[in-house]
Design a protein with these regions (language model features):
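Expand to "…catalyze enediolate/carbanion chemistry for C-C bond making/breaking, isomerization
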Residues: 1-222
């Protein structure tokens, strides 16, 4: 993990050092990955160049504490809204900017730590924000935060079941048995290719978490 990344040149330099290290130790070149932590305004401004600077990039990580200091945010509680700001989420643009770059360059988006290790409600609230946007995970600083992080970044059982039902229904509808249609009704919901893509995201998260489906798809009677 490379902290306080500000530009692509820092990634390129680290890539070169890792290549030398791999060759010296007889390792496959490219085996070692890079996680870039965005902790200041300059890093956020250059995030597209950072994300695309090396094929070693595996994730973009938000570093909230140093970032808050770098933009003079008036808060002493890492990850919480600054006092007096009541018109929305002060972190929304930052999180979305990191997420957009991560998705554009096919790397993971990881939310940074929540320092109130005894404030589990606060951790749940802040983790829920980035999980809802589509982040892949969040740093945990204390064992008590791990279970909550796994919970927040895994889909609810009903959402996981529904995603698998959508995939099954769409696969059936587009097959010859289902009439090779481009859309189909699942209950009161019309599902199509866009629905399938959305379901794939939820399904993948559920499968990665080891979830088991509790519903099965039954093709409608012809």
């Amino acid at each position: 993990m490379l902290p306080k990344v500000q530009n692509a040149e820092q990634i390129v330099a680290l890539d070169l050092l890792l290549t030398q290290l791999e060759r010296t130790n007889g390792l496959e070149v490219g085996r070692l990955g890079i996680e870039a932590q965005i902790e200041n305004a300059m890093g956020l401004i250059n995030i597209d160049a950072i994300a695309s600077a090396s094929p070693r990039i595996q994730s973009l990580i938000f570093g909230p504490a140093d970032f808050m200091a770098s933009i003079n945010m008036k808060s002493l509680v890492v990850g919480e809204q600054p006092p007096g700001y009541d018109t929305g989420d002060a972190y929304h643009y930052i999180l979305m900017r990191i997420l957009m770059a991560a998705r554009a360059y096919d790397v993971q988006a990881i939310d940074g730590p929540y320092l109130g290790i005894k404030d589990l409600d606060g951790f749940r609230r802040v983790a829920g924000r980035s999980a809802a946007l589509g982040f892949d995970g969040k740093w945990a600083l204390h064992p008590d935060q791990i279970e909550l992080a796994n919970e927040m970044f895994s889909p609810r059982q009903e959402d996981y079941d529904h995603s698998e039902m959508i995939l099954d229904a769409y696969d059936w509808a587009t097959s010859s048995a289902g009439g090779a249609k481009g859309a189909v009704m699942l209950g009161d919901e019309m599902i199509d290719e866009a629905s399938r893509k959305m379901a794939l995201v939820v399904s993948a998260k559920g499968r990665a978490a080891g979830m088991k489906r509790t519903q099965t798809f039954t093709p409608p009677a012809s």
